[in-house]
């Protein structure tokens, strides 16, 4: 009997905002999330309960039998833990979800590896509609590229291949659009609070500004 792609056993290494949203989305699509790792038991258990998986806070206890390992950690933690993450997983596919880290980080540590990058801002408290999230895929082997594209396609209609240089530019552009904008919102909120004005009066302006770039080039909408 031919196995479906959803039968692929998946381990999540990380239980933060992105990992939580992505693991839940794959779980809702029928994927088998077999284990969740996090440094903190509270985070590991919380996500594991949502996707009916085991959990651990010990890297040595991470299952060696999964077919796919999705690593979603802070950049510094990922680089620090890389040797332990990849130990005894030569036959498995390992991917990270970072826009800013090149695929070459895996070289010398894994045989099958890649990048599975959903470009969106995530929080644990708010579920994202993955149908609208663009995924950017890169893998060392062509067959793994196709596997990752197939997995992403179960979640989103917007799946692209992008190399590490392209993804770095995507990540930088996303920082300008999201992080810088949020910082400006915070400054505006502080100013309004100083004069006893509610931030909600800005929401129609924020919404219309965002809607404009769906129809006009950013420079034309200025």
Where are these regions (language model features)?
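Hydrophobic Val/Ile/Leu positions in short beta-strands of Rossmann-like dinucleotide-binding domains
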Residues: 11-12, 71, 137
């Amino acid at each position: 009997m031919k196995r479906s792609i959803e039968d692929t056993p998946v381990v999540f290494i990380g239980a933060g905002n992105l990992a939580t949203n992505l693991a839940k989305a794959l779980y809702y699509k029928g994927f088998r999330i077999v284990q969740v790792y996090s440094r903190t038991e509270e985070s590991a258990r919380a996500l594991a309960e949502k996707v009916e998986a085991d959990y651990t806070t010990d890297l040595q206890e991470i299952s060696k039998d999964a077919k796919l390992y999705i690593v979603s950690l802070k950049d510094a933690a990922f680089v620090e833990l890389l040797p332990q993450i990849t130990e005894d997983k030569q036959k498995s596919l390992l991917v990270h979800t970072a826009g800013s880290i090149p695929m070459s980080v895996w070289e010398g540590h894994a045989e099958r590896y890649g990048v599975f990058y959903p470009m969106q801002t995530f929080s644990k408290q708010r579920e994202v509609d993955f149908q609208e999230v663009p995924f950017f895929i890169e893998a060392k082997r062509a067959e793994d590229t196709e596997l990752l594209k197939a997995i992403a396609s179960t979640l989103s209609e917007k799946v692209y291949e992008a190399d590490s240089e392209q993804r770095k530019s995507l990540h930088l552009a996303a920082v300008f659009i999201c992080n810088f904008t949020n910082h400006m919102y915070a400054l505006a909120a502080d100013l309004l609070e100083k004069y006893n004005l509610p931030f909600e009066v800005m929401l129609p302006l924020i919404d219309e500004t965002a809607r404009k770039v769906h129809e006009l080039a950013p420079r034309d909408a200025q």
